[in-house]
Design a protein with these regions (language model features):
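Conserved nucleotide-sugar donor-binding catalytic segment
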Residues: 1-55
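Short amphipathic alpha-helical segments and their helix-coil junctions
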Residues: 3-9, 66-78, 101-108
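Sequence-level detector for tyrosine residue identity
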Residues: 7, 22, 45, 57-60, ...
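Generic secondary-structure transition motif, activating predominantly at the C-termini of alpha-helices
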Residues: 8-12, 28-31, 75, 109, ...
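Alpha-helical structural motif
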Residues: 20-23, 63-67, 89
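Catalytic core of nucleotide-sugar-dependent glycosyltransferases
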Residues: 39-46, 53-80
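Active-site-adjacent helix/loop segment of glycosyltransferases
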Residues: 78-94
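Membrane-interface aromatic/basic loop that binds lipid-linked glycans or pyrophosphate carriers
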Residues: 95-136
């Protein structure tokens, strides 16, 4: 587990944080899961400008490469529907545009979906950038 966290922190060097869901998906892929029926942690969610959900647009801009990686992975998950994969493709294109990733199509796992989703991804990237500008 330590090696995986170290690898991910090196892979996303320069980003303020990488998406925790991507880390969880990587762990689920590499290690067996144990199913238990008990609470392990109780979390109080922050409300306001500092909360994670309120700052999600900032996270998209601050860590676009980790979001793009997560979307790539989501496009390959067997349990995802075509709709889910298409939505992931839109978000993948948006994250790549925000990250100034030039090889976004070459790196795509589902090139067909990514090409179709490209115009919507471009629109989403403009929307996210404008939301962040309004927040700041």
């Amino acid at each position: 587990l330590k090696e995986l966290v170290k690898y991910l922190s090196e892979e996303f060097k320069g980003e303020k944080n990488f998406n925790p869901i991507y880390l969880l998906l990587q762990i689920c892929d590499k290690f067996p899961l144990v199913v238990i029926n008990e609470n392990l942690c109780i979390v109080e969610y922050q409300i306001g400008a500092d909360s994670m959900s309120q700052g999600i647009y900032k996270q998209y801009v601050n860590s676009p490469r980790s979001f793009a990686k997560m979307r790539l992975q989501e496009m390959t998950l067997k349990h995802n529907t075509l709709y889910d994969r298409f939505m992931s493709a839109i978000h993948y294109v948006s994250s790549c545009i925000i990250a100034n990733e030039r090889n976004w199509l070459r790196n795509a796992t589902r090139k067909d979906l990514v090409v179709i989703a490209a115009p919507l991804g471009w629109i989403l990237s403009i929307y996210v950038k404008r939301k962040v500008t309004k927040i700041l």
